[in-house]
């Protein structure tokens, strides 16, 4: 079974949009996975992946970090229910645009909600 290392807050909220992407890909493909929640200070949990950030997946002997690399791995290892179809390059463009334009604009909103939940 695939293990997904996911950022979790003390109140069990999952704030990482990068982990959300990995979960969306897993769900779309119909794959079962086990969440391995980790806090901001628990980086030792993903030391085996030589990564400081999530998401990281452990898929059998294969370790993959970064949401885009995870999507590519899942597409290759589990070709049923394709994620991208013939538009893989377009999907990568959109993901890069979201990372560079949309997420920075949303970050202050998300962070203020994390520190001042209503």
What is the predicted function of each stretch?
Residues 1-118:
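GST-like domain detector, emphasizing the conserved glutathione-binding G-site
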